[in-house]
Structures are given as C-alpha cells and as structure tokens.
Amino acid sequence: MINNEAFNLSLEQKFQLQCLQQEYQELDREQTVNYLLETMQQIMVRDNLIRDLMKNSLLP
C-alpha cells in the first residue's frame, strides 16, 4: 500500500519548485514550450523505467 505522504512534496522540493518558477517566468513562449516538451519526455522515460523495474522485480 502506498503511503499518502508519497503524494506530498518535501520542503526541499517545494523550494526547488519555487526557484524554477522564478527562473521560468523570464522565458518567452517558445522556450517555455520547449522546456515543457523536454520535461514531459523525461517524465515518460522515468515512467518507462519504473514500469520496467516493477515488471522485472515481479518475475521469479
């Protein structure tokens, strides 16, 4: 069972997010879209890695 705390950001993560928000306020639209697409790609790769790790750990 997943701990509900896993869905909350740590204080360090909240600070990191705030720093990124300030940094990206200055980006133009094209830079913002490029960053968003790059971030989504990284999230998809991470999801694939997690899925693969889970699949391999369940096999005998």
UniProtKB/Swiss-Prot annotation:
One short Pfam family name for this protein? NblA
Against InterPro entries, the record matches this protein to: NblA, NblA_sf
Tell me which positions the record assigns to the signal sequence: none
Superkingdom is Bacteria
- Sequence similarity: To Synechococcus PCC 7942 NblA and some, to chloroplast ycf18.
The name this protein goes by in its record: Phycobilisome degradation protein NblA homolog 2
